């Protein structure tokens, strides 16, 4: 099968219908200039063969294949190729009856593309199968050697080279079919999974359930039979027990009534003894009251009075102390306020000064603008009057200005002559002085060098001093700061110890229980671990926590145990281990209810009012997490007793509302709360810790600074010595005659510079004056026009000056208002500061008065405490006397209590006996009623009563334990009730249907699995055959590959071999030998040699099961002419089994072709000419097409 003709229409550069006829069955060549359309003919063949990678035909999509992308009115591209099919050995499968096969492919812009085979529509798969069956697989196109294919073959990996062998062996189509079969197996596998899912998720569970239901039904029937049997046995036992109870109760009743009579007699005897003892006790009480009662009362009254006086004086004393503390707090607040006011006052004064300065600037600017406005007005008036302004702004006539210009010119000329004379004299003097200086001795130079050396030494010392980064006297300043910090730390330690002495409960000290003890495991007292967010809640939080405020928090229960056993604690402590404590917290829903009830600002969880470290969360929830804090009693009452809340609530004043029945409150101590006191201790601790850290840092800095300071002092001493040396040298230099001469020289040089500058400036002045004079002359000639121009300019300047003056005036007024406002604020701050000073004086006087009163009251309190102690001692002595008398009475009372106890026991026994009698009567009645009821309910009792309890009968209670039967019966009733709810009476029939469906699906599953195993077996068998065919193809191609390469490059050899450690089925790679040396890889070959390797492989592929058509696109591009000619001759003489269509630009190649097609452009129209070739030359036969130049 080979190409006979190609018809192109609308394809790429071929706009009109173009027929390319007369293809030779063996060797055809296409040539032409670049861009003439020769490769488009090959692209059309690839397009028709169904290529999917459009980049190989130089297009990004199918629309690019239409002439000018459809923008020239042509919207369809069509390619038709007629194949000669007369050789039936090479005929595609199914087309053996056709001598010619015409295949057409069309693509329409915006539409779909279609195939036609012999004029009949065909799908893409059918066309692919047609060409693949004759080895023309365009998507793996080893028959198509395009531009760059040589390079691609060289870059192929072993699997890709193997795929070329597979294509040649014809096993590639099998691979495609195999993949399709595997996909079918995957689909069947999905069906199998579906069947398996139905079996596992639907049918199998249903069968299992039905089997269970069948078992339940059978079990239900069994239970019913057993219940019936056990019911008769248990009822018979109950009947016998009821008859026995009725007969036994009568005898027991008589026995209990006799016991009651005996106990009543004992009660009467004890009552008589108790009466006699009570009389003796009353007599003793009367005697005791008579002797001691009056004195005891007077002592108790005296003690109470002393305590009242002491409490009153102590309360007054505490109140004074509280007032003193309040005044001190007020003084501190006033001092802080005054400090803040002073800062604000200073800032405000700076702001006033800044704004005032700004106002002055605006006033100056406004004044300047006003003056400018007046000058502009004056200038306008002068111009209106016929005057003109000169450069200085003064008004003058043109003639006057011209005279002034002449004067300026004359003056400049005079100054220039003077400067010239002065310059000449200075230059002469300089020349003579320089000659004198050269004659001076070299002593000055030596001193100058010494001075420069000292100066450099000083600079070096200064650089070294700067590198030390040391400030002078820094060490002394740090030492003074160290002394001040030490004093502050000592004062703070004393203050801290004094505060702890006042509040011993806030101290927690312990000894390390073991060596290397981690003190971080002991967190401290609860009071020390919290910070109160708002001091107004301190009292409430203290009430919430209660004694837990002094609990100790630790990390684990192990730490707690070690502290208690070996910590040598000074007093008893309760310890909270964070890892074991069970903490509860008020739920967020409860909090929302409470907030909705009284308002979100009036109720808070106590836990939210304190700050603490996150690691203490559980401990703090334990102490504060279960209580609300409200702002007043009304809200607290609402929250505590609301049925949705029912939670303990505390007011800010310390009143407690507990829904479980307790309410506490009333007047509380006026002293500051423990938490407030402890906050003062913590503040001192924090300040002390800060100062100690500062001291440590300062000591480290001093230690590091010591060496630096010593080094600095040494360098400073050296620098001072060099400075003194430099001063002496400088004085010596200044007093030398050379120095004086040098100063005169410098003065002369300065005079020369000034004279030259004066000459330059006078020339510029003279030039400007002359230019101005010339301009004024021109003005005189055009006086009227100049006057109008000056008038307009003057009007413009006047308007501009007026606008600017108005703006300046407005800004100044705004700034004045701002200054007045901020001045008022400053005065207000000053008045407030003065008021604070007055309040501070008043507070200081009040503090002084309170301190005096407290000193006096302290003595009175001490005296009252002594009186209380004395009264309590006298009262104690009197109570001891009374205690002795009380012991006698106590003995008598004990005897009375003994008799009362006996009576109580007797009465209790009587009540128990009465209860037992009632119980026996009730049991006898119940038993009789039960016997009657059972006889009426169960007819079989009368008939079988004589068998109850008899051996070897159905009612043998020894063989069948009735109690166990009753328990078993109860369990069976429960089982029956449970089974009765779930038992399915249709389970037997439904189970049969489900099992039939299960068997049917299992049968289908086995069929699918058998089909799958057969397909896999077939694939395995075909794989073996494929491997055999592939091995044969490899050996044949390998042999031809070496032979062709040796022909193209004499003395060389090549072969295809699997990579090391792999087989032929894994891939193949090139092995090349030049002479007797085998190369490791192709990179050791030249570019032309590598090209011959790739081309030899391609040609060897053509010798094995050749495709009917081969297309070569400029494969000789990288080869020289001798190799090209050899290739052409080889194709002509050795490859007579297939049709070759070759594109080439080299005569050595296309001269060997039987038919040559040449593409050209003539006047912008594309043409294709056909030539038949022989050794005599080329005879043009026909020109087939014309088309527009490709885009």
From Swiss-Prot:
Gene3D superfamilies with a match to the protein in the record: 1.20.1060.20, 3.30.70.1620, P-loop containing nucleotide triphosphate hydrolases
GO biological process, alphabetically ordered: cell division; kinetochore organization; meiotic chromosome condensation; meiotic chromosome segregation; mitotic chromosome condensation; positive regulation of chromosome condensation; positive regulation of chromosome segregation; positive regulation of chromosome separation
Key words, A-Z: Acetylation, ATP-binding, Cell cycle, Cell division, Chromosome, Coiled coil, Cytoplasm, DNA condensation, Mitosis, Nucleotide-binding, Nucleus
Modified-residue entries (N6-acetyllysine), positions: 114, 222, 677, 1158, 1160
Keyword Nucleus in record: yes
Pfam families to which the protein is assigned, alphabetical: SMC_hinge, SMC_N
Record localization: Nucleus; Cytoplasm; Chromosome
All residue ranges annotated as the SMC hinge domain in the record: 521-640
GO cellular component, one term: condensin complex
Positions contributing to ATP binding: 32-39
GO molecular function, one term: single-stranded DNA binding
Coiled coil regions in record: 173-507, 672-936, 963-1031
Primary role: Central component of the condensin complex, a complex required for conversion of interphase chromatin into mitotic-like condense chromosomes. The condensin complex probably introduces positive supercoils into relaxed DNA in the presence of type I topoisomerases and converts nicked DNA into positive knotted forms in the presence of type II topoisomerases.
Domain notes: The SMC hinge domain, which separates the large intramolecular coiled coil regions, allows the heterodimerization with SMC4, forming a V-shaped heterodimer.
Subunit structure: Forms a heterodimer with SMC4. Component of the condensin complex, which contains the SMC2 and SMC4 heterodimer, and three non SMC subunits that probably regulate the complex: BRRN1/CAPH, CNAP1/CAPD2 and CAPG.
Family membership noted in the UniProt record: Belongs to the SMC family. SMC2 subfamily.
Record's protein name: Structural maintenance of chromosomes protein 2
Originating organism: Mus musculus
Lineage: Eukaryota, Metazoa, Chordata, Craniata, Vertebrata
Gene assigned in the entry: Smc2
């Amino acid at each position: 099968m080979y190409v006979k003709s190609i018809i192109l229409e609308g394809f790429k550069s071929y706009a009109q219908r173009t027929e390319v006829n007369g293809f030779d069955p063996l060797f055809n060549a296409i040539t032409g200039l670049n861009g003439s359309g020769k490769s488009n003919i090959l692209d059309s063949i690839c397009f028709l063969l169904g290529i999917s990678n459009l980049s190989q035909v130089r297009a990004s999509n199918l629309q690019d294949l239409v002439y000018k992308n459809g923008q020239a009115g042509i919207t369809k591209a069509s390619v038709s190729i007629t194949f000669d099919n007369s050789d039936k050995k090479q005929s595609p499968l199914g087309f053996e009856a056709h001598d010619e096969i015409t295949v057409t492919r069309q693509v329409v812009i915006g539409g779909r593309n279609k195939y036609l085979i012999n004029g009949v529509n065909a799908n893409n798969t059918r066309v692919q199968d047609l060409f693949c069956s004759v080895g023309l697989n365009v998507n793996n196109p080893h028959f198509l050697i395009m531009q760059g294919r040589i390079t691609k073959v060289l870059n192929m990996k072993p699997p890709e080279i193997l795929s070329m062998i597979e294509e040649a062996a014809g096993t590639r189509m099998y691979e495609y079919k195999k993949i399709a079969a595997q996909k079918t197996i995957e689909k069947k596998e999905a069906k199998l999974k579906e069947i398996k899912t139905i079996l596992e998720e639907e049918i199998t569970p249903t069968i299992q359930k039905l089997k269970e239901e069948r078992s339940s039904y059978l079990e239900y029937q069994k239970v019913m039979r057993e219940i019936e049997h056990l019911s008769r046995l248990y009822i018979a036992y109950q009947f016998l027990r009821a008859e026995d109870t009725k007969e036994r109760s009568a005898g027991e009743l008589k026995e209990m009534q006799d016991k009651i009579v005996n106990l009543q007699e004992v009660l009467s005897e004890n009552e008589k003894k108790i009466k006699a003892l009570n009389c003796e006790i009353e007599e003793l009480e009367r005697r005791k009251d008579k002797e001691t009662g009056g004195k005891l009362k007077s002592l108790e009254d005296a003690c109470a009075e002393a305590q009242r006086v002491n409490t009153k004086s102590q309360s007054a004393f505490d109140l004074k102390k509280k007032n003193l503390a309040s005044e001190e707090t007020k003084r501190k607040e006033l001092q802080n306020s005054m400090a803040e006011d002073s800062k604000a006052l200073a800032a405000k004064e700076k702001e006033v000064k800044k704004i005032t300065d700004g106002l002055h600037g605006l006033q100056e600017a406004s004044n300047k603008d006003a003056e400018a406005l007046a000058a502009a007005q004056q200038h306008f008036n002068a111009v209106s009057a016929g005057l003109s302004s000169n450069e200085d702004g003064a008004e003058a006539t043109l003639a006057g200005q011209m005279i002034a210009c002449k004067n300026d010119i004359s003056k400049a000329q005079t100054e220039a002559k003077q400067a010239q004379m002065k310059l000449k004299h200075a230059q002469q003097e300089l020349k003579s002085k320089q000659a004198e200086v050269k004659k001076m001795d070299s002593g000055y130079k030596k001193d100058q060098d010494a001075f420069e050396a000292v100066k450099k030494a000083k600079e070096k010392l200064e650089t070294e001093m700067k590198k030390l980064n040391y400030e002078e006297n820094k060490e002394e300043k740090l030492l003074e700061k160290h002394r001040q910090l030490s004093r502050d730390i000592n004062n703070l330690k004393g203050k801290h110890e004094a505060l702890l002495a006042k509040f011993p409960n806030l101290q927690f000290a312990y000894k390390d229980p073991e060596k290397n003890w981690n003190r971080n495991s002991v967190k401290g007292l609860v009071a020390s671990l919290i910070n109160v967010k708002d001091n107004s809640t301190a009292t409430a939080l203290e009430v919430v926590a209660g004694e837990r405020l002094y609990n100790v928090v630790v990390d684990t229960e192990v730490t707690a145990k070690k502290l208690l056993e070996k910590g040598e604690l000074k007093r008893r402590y309760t310890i909270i281990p964070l890892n074991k404590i069970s903490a509860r917290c008020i739920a967020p829903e409860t909090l929302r209810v409470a907030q909705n009830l009284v308002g979100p600002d009036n109720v808070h969880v106590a836990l939210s009012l304190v700050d603490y470290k996150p690691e203490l969360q559980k401990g703090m929830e334990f102490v504060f997490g279960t209580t609300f804090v409200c702002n007043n009693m009304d809200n607290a009452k609402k929250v505590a007793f609301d049925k949705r809340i029912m939670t303990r609530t505390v007011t800010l004043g310390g009143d407690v509302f507990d829904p479980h029945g307790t309410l506490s409150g009333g007047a509380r101590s006026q002293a500051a709360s423990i938490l407030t006191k402890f906050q003062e201790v913590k503040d001192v601790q924090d300040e002390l810790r800060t100062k100690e850290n500062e001291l440590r840092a300062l000591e480290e800095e001093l230690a590091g600074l010591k060496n630096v300071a010593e080094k600095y002092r040494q360098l400073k001493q050296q620098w001072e010595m060099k400075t003194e040396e430099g001063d002496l040298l400088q004085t010596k230099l200044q007093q030398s005659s050379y120095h004086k001469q040098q100063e005169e020289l410098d003065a002369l040089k300065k005079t020369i510079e000034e004279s030259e500058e004066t000459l330059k400036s006078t020339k510029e002045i003279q030039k400007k004056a002359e230019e101005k004079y010339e301009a004024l002359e021109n003005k005189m000639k055009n006086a009227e026009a100049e006057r109008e121009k000056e008038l307009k300019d003057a009007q413009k300047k006047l308007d501009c000056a007026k606008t600017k003056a108005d703006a300046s005036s407005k800004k100044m007024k705004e700034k004045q208002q701002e200054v007045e406002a901020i001045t008022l604020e400053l005065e207000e701050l000053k008045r407030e500061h003065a008021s604070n000073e007055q309040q501070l004086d008043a507070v200081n006087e009040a503090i002084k008065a309170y301190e005096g009163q407290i000193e006096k009251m302290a003595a009175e309190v001490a005296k009252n405490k002594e009186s209380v102690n004395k009264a309590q001692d006298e009262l104690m002595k009197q109570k001891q006397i009374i205690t002795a008398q009380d012991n006698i009475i106590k003995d008598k009372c004990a005897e009375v209590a003994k008799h009362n106890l006996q009576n109580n026991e007797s009465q209790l026994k009587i009540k128990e006996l009465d209860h037992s009698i009632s119980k026996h009567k009730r049991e006898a009645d119940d038993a009789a009623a039960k016997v009657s009821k059972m006889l009426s309910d169960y007819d079989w009792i009368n008939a079988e009563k004589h068998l109850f309890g008899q051996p070897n009968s159905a009612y043998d209670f020894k063989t069948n334990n009735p109690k166990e039967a009753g328990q078993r019966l109860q369990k069976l009733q429960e089982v029956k009730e449970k089974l009765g709810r779930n038992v399915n009476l249709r389970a037997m029939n439904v189970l049969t249907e489900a099992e039939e469906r299960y068997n049917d699906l299992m049968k289908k599953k086995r069929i699918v699995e058998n089909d799958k195993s057969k397909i896999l077996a077939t694939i395995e068998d075909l794989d073996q055959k494929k491997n055999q065919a592939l091995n044969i193809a490899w050996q044949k191609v390998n042999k031809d590959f070496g032979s062709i390469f040796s022909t193209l490059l004499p003395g060389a050899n090549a072969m295809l071999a699997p990579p090391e450690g792999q087989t032929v089925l894994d891939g193949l790679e090139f092995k090349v030998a030049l002479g007797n040396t085998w190369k490791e890889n192709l990179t050791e070959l030249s570019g032309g040699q590598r090209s011959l390797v790739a081309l030899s492989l391609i040609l060897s592929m053509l010798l094995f099961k050749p495709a009917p058509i081969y297309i070569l696109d400029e494969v000789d591009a990288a080869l020289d002419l001798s190799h090209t000619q050899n290739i052409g001759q080889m194709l002509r003489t050795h490859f007579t089994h297939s049709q070759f269509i070759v594109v080439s630009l080299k005569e050595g190649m296309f001269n060997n072709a039987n038919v040559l097609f040449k593409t050209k452009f003539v006047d912008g129209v594309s043409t294709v000419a056909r030539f038949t070739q022989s050794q005599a030359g080329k005879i043009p036969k026909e020109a087939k097409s014309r088309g527009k130049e490709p885009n």
